From Swiss-Prot:
Gene field: CYP6B2
Protein name as annotated: Cytochrome P450 6B2
SUPFAM superfamilies hit by this protein: Cytochrome P450 (SSF48264)
Organism: Helicoverpa armigera
EC number: 1.14.14.1
PROSITE patterns noted in UniProt: CYTOCHROME_P450
Residues engaged in binding heme: C445
GO cellular component: endoplasmic reticulum membrane
Amino acid sequence: MWIFYFPAVISVLIVTLYFYFTRTFNYWKKRNVRGPEPVVFFGNLKDSALRKKNMGVVMEELYNMFPEEKVIGIYRMTSPCLLVRDLEVIKHIMIKDFEVFSDRGLEFSKEGLGQNLFHADGDTWRTLRNRFTPIFTSGKLKNMFYLMNEGADNFIDHVSKECEKHQEFEIHTLLQTYTMSTISSCAFGVSYDTISDKLDTLAIVDKIISEPSYAIELDMMYPGLLPKLNLSIFPSVVHKFFKNLVNTIVTQRNGKPSGRNDFMDLILELRQMGEITSNKYGNNMSTLEITESVMCAQAFVFYIAGYETSATTMAYLTYQLALNPDIQNKLIAEIDEAIKANGGKVTYDTVKDMKYLNKVFDETLRMYSIVEPLQRKAIRDYKLPGTDVVIEKDTVVLISPRGIHYDPKYYDNPKQFNPERFFAEEVGKRHPCAYLPFGLGQRNCIGMRFGRLQSLLCITKLLSKFRLEPSKNTDRNLQVEPYRFIIGPKGGIRLNIVPRKDVS
């Protein structure tokens, strides 16, 4: 008898699910906020969820759909989010009214790696930020420079040996060997060779970190679900690797700072304190216990900031130099002159003071922002300046640096690689929020100066000995890898590295 009711039950179930997954789809219409029509189950993120397009590309496309709007109403699954286009509104969110948008709203279990400086919110973030900011001061970076320099010299030796065998390289993979060496030394006080026995595990860890699991999609489409299920976006192998790494270093240093003044020394100083405090809003004190989990979480986020993002940025930079020989020639001339003026040595100040090199780096990040979108969550109701839109508490706000960086309103011929955009007079003409590779305000990338320094040093050393040229396999129309967390090139980047004939 039940077989007669089965079609009716299925129909009711389908209708129920349909209404459940579309129940919020009038949210922005009721508030007179324009936006694209959402799709059942996926909202506006179907191509990202199905791994057809990178999230950064999806956000750029959404940004371009409504060029006259200050904000665009979109949906992550059933959750209403606001994509902000207007630069003045962005300035309020990131800087002027930061206290309303101090949280990122990346919600998952606070156990394991969850309590890191990037993902943490509220008092935990403020406490961590207050304590970890000092490691990225100019003085600290200058003290670490000799470690970076050793890594860069070893990298150049490696490239020289490889060039005797072949000229073509997959440049991103090659540059990862340098950033791994640098981060191992500057952060953890170990040489690349010391952890060679763990490279197989590290390769797995890198793949897992770079290629998002469906837990990330769940976090995006069902905000708040992961903490309820006590889940993390990172599998247990990642937790285990960083736990073992930190424990090994703590044991080697007998649980005390070593005097290297590296990242692990700072961690150990905090560990000796047992807990750390900082001021909350309202002048109350916030306290965070320095557990093994907290230590591992900070080691993890430092690794992320210093390894993959820098390698990817340098890969794009070398790609553009290979395709633009005039720019490469100008940069080589600056590098040669700077090194000669410093007696043949490359110092911290040598790298920092090369103006054209820094402009090339900035233009690379304009064209190839690495992590997108920028995300903030309102901690209370907030009326957007210059609009009638009220953002309700806990609403997620998104910003697309890629959309802004390719907007012809702010950059002429935005698809063209042109470091001249970053001469002071040109920068002064633009809105400060027209360039957002590191975010802006108090929640900008805390490691941006470290990443810049290690990248510029590597490029300086590389171009002092070699030229970069397209190979027969160079893709002149790079596509973005659709499923990586980091916005990397699909299929990698193949270039020729050719020893310079004018240097010994």
